[in-house]
Amino acid sequence: MIVEKPCRVVAVVSGGPDSTCYTALWLKRGCDVHALSFLYGQKAVVEVERAQLLLRRLDGIAAERGWGRVVEHRVVDLSSLGELWRGTQLTDPSVSVEQSYTPTVVVPIRNVVMAAVATAYAYTVGRNAGAKTYVILGSHYDDIKPREDTWEPLYPDCSPECVEAMQTAFRICHFRGERGVEIWTPSREGLRKSQLLKMCHQEVGDLIYDTWSCYKSGEAHCGSCESCKNRHAAFIEAGLPDCTAYLTPPGPGFEKRGQFYLHISCKKQ
């Protein structure tokens, strides 16, 4: 893609590797970042705390390298939505977090809700800014693998088609002269999770190990949920050591070090 300069980005940053790495990519592209993290009643509320830490560190790296800067980080409290999003593993206390993918892991059109808020803010920060404004989310190409039963995307609101439809709708819903906001995701750029991790590690190094993927909040990644397993698989596929601390091994090749399990590829002490 061609990024118009000067540029600013409203980034939805969860604290996970996908949104963190994609934000780093846009900082490297020279765009200033207005970061938004969302409280939406999720069980893994620790991810927002990680986002705050990671964005501070990313801004330090960006300053050293002459990239764009993290202008601000706002936490948007939509926690009351957790009462509406019932029956999903991520928000409903009565629904257990599964060890493999089932449709109940999907929070219905969560990305659409967040993208709508982010785009509304983008129209605000972009007004009279004299810069091209983008909205970015971390959904990647692996999120849209087909389900085995219906062949629909695993996570429908992560698809490029959904992203492009949102962009069109949000433009139609605003004034003609201010319709320049674009919405981008790794999936729209054709990037897989492992590709994001590899690119990110080349730029920010071990910072990627401080991201949070687990669907639960705990002292370390649980290692048993689908997201933990996807995280580990992506590190291995990217040819990177997985230095994530897990409570249980998400795959083969792990050894216990102290309280946690680390993969044998990790040489960190």
From Swiss-Prot:
GO terms for molecular function: ATP binding; ligase activity, forming carbon-nitrogen bonds; zinc ion binding. InterPro entries: QueC, Rossmann-like_a/b/a_fold. Its cofactor is Zn(2+). Zn(2+) binds at residues 214, 222, 225, 228. Keywords: ATP-binding, Ligase, Metal-binding, Nucleotide-binding, Zinc. It catalyses: 7-carboxy-7-deazaguanine + NH4(+) + ATP = 7-cyano-7-deazaguanine + ADP + phosphate + H2O + H(+). The keyword Ligase applies. It is an enzyme of class 6 (ligase). Transmembrane segments: none annotated. Pathway: Purine metabolism; 7-cyano-7-deazaguanine biosynthesis. Its EC number is 6.3.4.20. Binds 1 zinc ion per subunit. ATP binds at residues 13-23. Catalyzes the ATP-dependent conversion of 7-carboxy-7-deazaguanine (CDG) to 7-cyano-7-deazaguanine (preQ(0)). Belongs to the QueC family. This is 7-cyano-7-deazaguanine synthase. It comes from Pyrobaculum aerophilum (strain ATCC 51768 / DSM 7523 / JCM 9630 / CIP 104966 / NBRC 100827 / IM2). The lineage of its organism: Archaea, Thermoproteota, Thermoprotei, Thermoproteales, Thermoproteaceae.
